[in-house]
């Protein structure tokens, strides 16, 4: 198929049909009515707003998660916003059906209505970037800006989003670090179409800075501060938020995820295929990978605290890195880490090390030498120096248990204690993690060399 045929076939799969559009519009209308009823019943000075892809009509067929914001006036205290916003969320959640509490910057409600997940989030009713008080406030401005500037390019955005999902580069969550939906929308608006964005992959990396909102002309000093800050942090892309010059929309985008986009764009333009949008699942045998590489897999299994992924997974990542560093100090070579809500993978060179360490001590005729002599069990002389043999745990499980016991590793504050009581598995993972282990060991997660067969 040529590129136009591939795009047309992709569109057939990702653009909502009329029946689905009617369902979404009816759903939003019913939820909005219930939200207004709730606000009135509680006698709140607040307004309901829909934000996100459903509100912008850039959602993919079958993807109906809905974000409803309860916006309070700017003179509302943060404490009152949290209290009343959560109260409204609970009452509305009960009307919609079942709900649960979730936690981010402040608590919010996750409900479900007619099979669709609905996040009910309190925020401030901001009119400009200068009004922003909490991290979620901009979402209202984002939705309004996209609707005003998209100008019929909804399906171009859908193509780009599905492409990013297919190449595993979609999602700005801290544990993904890919392209957010809003970033995808900005790039389509900036460059005009899905294909134009792909064609500009190399250009935007070299240009580095995208200022669709023309903030350099309107707020040059603030914008330059943003650019300087982000450049110092070596971000692959700086996209000044069209509604707020203080923010880089691509702040969470990692070099790895941009790299997937960079190579996939080049490959798709050279050899278009529906596979980029809808790839087959990569599967393999992690045991075969271990045999091929001659390395070992250490798996930590633990029961995670009840936190949303945005709060939990960065802490698990920090812990995985801390354990890797601790093992390196102990003499093991760590080739890579991976993690999830309840596991950490560490690929290491070996699982056994010598059970003794040789320590070089002070000169034998000094007071320090006397203390060294008294402290150690097996002591000998090499030249003027005292030497000693220290017993250490040789098996990596023993080493990790000693690291846990002493707490000698960097870890997320909410996960350190549960990590200490982890089950430690060597070269084996439970069946649900088998393919995850394969993807990690084979490095397929960030593989940019596609098969040409």
Curated annotation (Swiss-Prot):
The lineage of its organism: Archaea, Methanobacteriati, Methanobacteriota, Thermococci, Thermococcales. Pfam families: CAA_C, NTP_transf_2, tRNA_NucTransf2. The keyword Kinase does not apply. ATP binds at residues 53, 56, 142, 161, 170. It catalyses: a tRNA precursor + 2 CTP + ATP = a tRNA with a 3' CCA end + 3 diphosphate; a tRNA with a 3' CCA end + 2 CTP + ATP = a tRNA with a 3' CCACCA end + 3 diphosphate. Belongs to the tRNA nucleotidyltransferase/poly(A) polymerase family. Archaeal CCA-adding enzyme subfamily. Keywords: ATP-binding, Magnesium, Metal-binding, Nucleotide-binding, Nucleotidyltransferase, RNA repair, RNA-binding, Transferase, tRNA processing. CTP binds at residues 53, 56, 142, 161, 170. One of its GO terms (biological process) is tRNA 3'-terminal CCA addition. Catalyzes the addition and repair of the essential 3'-terminal CCA sequence in tRNAs without using a nucleic acid template. Adds these three nucleotides in the order of C, C, and A to the tRNA nucleotide-73, using CTP and ATP as substrates and producing inorganic pyrophosphate. tRNA 3'-terminal CCA addition is required both for tRNA processing and repair. Also involved in tRNA surveillance by mediating tandem CCA addition to generate a CCACCA at the 3' terminus of unstable tRNAs. While stable tRNAs receive only 3'-terminal CCA, unstable tRNAs are marked with CCACCA and rapidly degraded. This is CCA-adding enzyme. Its cofactor is Mg(2+). Its EC number is 2.7.7.72. InterPro entries: CAA_C, CCA-adding_arc, CCA_tRNA_nucleotrans_2, NT_2-5OAS_ClassI-CCAase, NT_sf, NuclTrfase_I-like_C, Polymerase_NTP_transf_dom, tRNA_NucTransf2. GO terms for molecular function: ATP binding; CCA tRNA nucleotidyltransferase activity; magnesium ion binding; tRNA binding.
């Amino acid at each position: 198929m040529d590129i136009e045929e591939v795009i047309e076939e992709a569109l057939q799969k990702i653009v909502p049909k009329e029946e689905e559009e009617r369902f979404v519009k009816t759903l939003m209308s019913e939820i909005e009515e219930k939200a207004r009823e709730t606000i009135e019943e509680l006698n709140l000075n607040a307004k309901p707003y829909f934000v996100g892809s459903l509100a912008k009509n850039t959602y993919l067929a079958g993807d109906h998660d809905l974000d409803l914001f309860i916006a309070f006036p700017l003179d509302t205290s943060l404490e009152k916003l949290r209290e009343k916003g959560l109260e409204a969320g609970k009452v509305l959640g009960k009307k919609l059906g079942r709900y649960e509490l979730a936690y981010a910057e402040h608590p919010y409600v996750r409900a479900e209505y007619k099979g669709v997940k609905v996040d009910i989030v309190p925020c401030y009713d901001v009119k400009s970037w200068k009004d922003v008080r909490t991290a979620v406030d901009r979402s209202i401005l984002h939705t309004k800006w996209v609707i005003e500037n998209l100008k019929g390019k909804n399906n171009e955005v859908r193509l780009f989003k599905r492409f990013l999902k297919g190449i595993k580069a979609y999602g700005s969550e801290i544990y993904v670090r890919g392209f957010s939906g809003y970033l995808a929308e900005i790039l389509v608006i900036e460059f005009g179409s899905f294909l134009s964005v792909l064609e500009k992959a190399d250009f935007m990396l070299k240009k580095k800075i995208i200022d669709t909102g023309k903030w350099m002309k309107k707020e040059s000093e603030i914008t330059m501060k943003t650019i300087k800050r982000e450049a110092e942090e070596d971000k692959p892309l700086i996209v000044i938020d069209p509604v707020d010059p203080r923010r880089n929309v691509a702040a969470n985008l990692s070099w790895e995820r941009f790299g997937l986009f960079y190579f996939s764009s080049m490959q798709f333009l050279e050899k278009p295929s529906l596979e980029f949008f809808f790839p087959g699942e990569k599967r393999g045998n992690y045991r075969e990978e271990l045999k091929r590489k001659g390395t070992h897999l250490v798996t930590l299994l633990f029961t995670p605290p009840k936190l949303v992924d945005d709060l939990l997974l960065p802490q698990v990542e920090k812990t995985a890195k801390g354990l890797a560093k601790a093992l390196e100090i102990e003499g093991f070579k760590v080739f890579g880490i991976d993690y999830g809500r309840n596991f950490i993978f560490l690929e290491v060179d070996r699982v056994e090390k010598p059970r003794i360490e040789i320590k070089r001590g002070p000169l034998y005729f000094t007071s320090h030498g006397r203390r060294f002599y008294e402290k150690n069990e097996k002591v000998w002389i090499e030249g003027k120096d005292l030497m000693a043999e220290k017993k250490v745990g040789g098996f990596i499980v023993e080493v990790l248990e000693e690291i846990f016991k002493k707490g000698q590793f960097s870890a997320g504050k909410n996960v350190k204690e549960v990590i200490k009581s982890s089950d430690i598995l060597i070269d084996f993972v439970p069946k649900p993690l088998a393919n995850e282990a394969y993807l990690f060991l084979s490095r397929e997660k960030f593989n940019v060399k596609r098969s040409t067969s």
